[in-house]
Each structure stands twice: as structure tokens, then as C-alpha cells.
């Protein structure tokens, strides 16, 4: 009997929620709303391209020698995965370090507003999700860092929208504690007028307030503020189209 790859069980990840008490399927949900400058030409070609690059751990510096010939562990940076999404006249670059896996990327555009969402996909939707221990989950919400860099794009190629529905993380959106998740934020004000950005991390299978955190960032009318975004009303998720 042939079992589709998406349904095959493996020891470290599963296509349905784990029954184990101490295991968690951690997910991340990143929502961004960009208002472009008034004079920016309207471009509603969303999902023009998505590229993913993982920068592996940095090689130890050969010039640095320790006394016992072993390389120092502290010099090795954890790998960062970058997603570059081009669409709607923007190139949005997101970097994720020590975070849950991104499995779904979607965009929508309406006039001068471009929205994007990057998220994990909860088990049971045909994508595997690793189950990690409670301790690993606590470390993840402390260590996960998301960086963002938004540039202007003059890409003219057509949208490459996928026909499947946008899959989501299923993380609950109740009020949770803040954690400093957002790292560097860079915007090109030539085309970006306002920016609202929300990140949420949590257990995708069961509500666990201890494992749910959020962070937010706003850049409105030239001034930045952190932690102030209400992600539930930030964008209309029903209008998003799948880019991957």
C-alpha cells in the first residue's frame, strides 16, 4: 500500500497532534501591513516570487586559536532562514533565527496597502510539524528572533498565486504576554509610509498560556513604537492568497 508522503508518520514529526503530555507543536504567525507612499505607483501583482535562503552556521575563524586547539562554541551563530517575498511593489525580507518553521506564505494588496502573512502550519493539514519538549518550547519562545527589511521593488512579472487555500498556524489569538521577538527592522521610506507588524508564537495543538507570546512593531507617520499592534484586526485574512 502506498501512503502519500504527507501522511507518513516519522518519529520526530507527525501529521497530527501528538498525544504526549510533555510535547508541543510550536508555531509562529507573522502578520504585516504596509501602507505605501501616496505617490507610489499602484501595483497589485502579489506573490511575484518567493525565495528561501538558509545561512548555515558561521565557520569558526581560523585565525583564532584556543589554548587546547578546540574551537570555542560561543563563536558559532545559529542558522538564520531568510524569506524574500516580492509583490505589490515591495520586496519584503524576513529573517528567522531559532524560530518555528514557516510553511505558509501569503499576500494581498488593496490600493496602496500590501499585506503579508508568514506562518507555521498546524498538524492535520498535510504538512509535518515537529513535536518538541516543554523545555525546548520555552527556549524557543525566548530565543526566536525575527528581522524584517522592506524595500521598494519595480518587478513587473505576473503574480504566481497558488490555487490551494492559505494554511494557518491555528495559534489562539487571546491576549498573551509580550516577549522581545522582533530584531532589526529596516524600511525604505521612499516607498513605505506606514508599517504594522505582529509576531505571535504558540502551541498549535493545545492552548498553553505559558508557551504563548507576541511582539509587535508600528512605524506610523515617521515614528516607531514597539509592542502596540492588535494583530486580530490588522489585516483581513480572508483576502490573502497563497504564494507558496
From Swiss-Prot:
<dbReference type="InterPro" id="IPR036540">
    <property type="entry name" value="Pox_vCCI-like_sf"/>
</dbReference>
<dbReference type="InterPro" id="IPR003184">
    <property type="entry name" value="Orthopox_35kDa"/>
</dbReference>
<feature type="compositionally biased region" description="Acidic residues">
    <location>
        <begin position="54"/>
        <end position="77"/>
    </location>
</feature>
<dbReference type="Pfam" id="PF02250">
    <property type="entry name" value="Orthopox_35kD"/>
</dbReference>
<comment type="function">
    <text>The protein is truncated in this vaccinal strain and presumably inactive, because the lack of signal peptide prevents the protein of being secreted. In the wild-type viruses inhibits host immune defense by binding to host chemokines. Binds host CC chemokines (beta chemokines) such as RANTES with high affinity, but not CXC or C chemokines (alpha and gamma chemokines).</text>
</comment>
<dbReference type="GO" id="GO:0030430">
    <property type="term" value="C:host cell cytoplasm"/>
</dbReference>
<protein>
    <recommendedName>
        <fullName>Inactive chemokine-binding protein</fullName>
    </recommendedName>
</protein>
<keyword id="KW-1035">Host cytoplasm</keyword>
<keyword id="KW-0244">Early protein</keyword>
<feature type="compositionally biased region" description="Polar residues">
    <location>
        <begin position="37"/>
        <end position="53"/>
    </location>
</feature>
<comment type="similarity">
    <text>Belongs to the orthopoxvirus OPG001 family.</text>
</comment>
<dbReference type="InterPro" id="IPR009173">
    <property type="entry name" value="Chemkine-bd_vir"/>
</dbReference>
<feature type="region of interest" description="Disordered">
    <location>
        <begin position="1"/>
        <end position="79"/>
    </location>
</feature>
Amino acid at each position: 500500500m502506498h501512503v502519500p508522503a504527507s501522511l507518513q508518520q516519522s518519529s520526530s514529526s507527525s501529521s497530527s497532534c501528538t498525544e504526549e503530555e510533555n510535547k508541543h507543536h510550536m508555531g509562529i504567525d507573522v502578520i504585516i501591513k504596509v501602507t505605501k507612499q501616496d505617490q507610489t505607483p499602484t501595483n497589485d501583482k502579489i506573490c511575484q516570487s518567493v525565495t528561501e535562503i538558509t545561512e548555515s552556521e558561521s565557520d569558526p575563524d581560523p585565525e583564532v586559536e584556543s589554548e587546547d586547539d578546540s574551537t570555542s562554541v560561543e563563536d558559532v551563530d545559529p542558522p538564520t532562514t531568510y524569506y524574500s517575498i516580492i509583490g505589490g511593489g515591495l520586496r519584503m525580507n524576513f529573517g528567522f533565527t531559532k524560530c518555528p518553521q514557516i510553511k505558509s506564505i501569503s499576500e494581498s494588496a488593496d490600493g496602496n496597502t500590501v499585506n503579508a502573512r508568514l506562518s507555521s502550519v498546524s498538524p492535520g493539514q498535510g504538512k509535518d510539524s515537529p513535536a518538541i519538549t516543554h523545555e525546548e518550547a520555552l527556549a524557543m519562545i525566548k530565543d526566536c528572533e525575527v528581522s524584517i527589511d522592506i524595500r521598494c521593488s519595480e518587478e513587473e512579472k505576473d503574480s504566481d498565486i497558488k490555487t490551494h487555500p492559505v494554511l494557518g498556524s491555528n495559534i489562539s489569538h487571546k491576549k498573551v504576554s509580550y516577549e522581545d521577538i522582533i530584531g532589526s527592522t529596516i524600511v525604505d521610506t521612499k516607498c513605505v509610509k506606514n508599517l504594522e507588524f505582529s509576531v505571535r508564537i504558540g502551541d498549535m495543538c493545545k492552548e498553553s498560556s505559558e508557551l504563548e507570546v507576541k511582539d509587535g512593531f508600528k512605524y506610523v507617520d515617521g515614528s516607531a513604537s514597539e509592542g502596540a499592534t492588535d494583530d486580530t484586526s490588522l489585516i483581513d485574512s480572508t483576502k490573502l492568497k497563497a504564494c507558496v
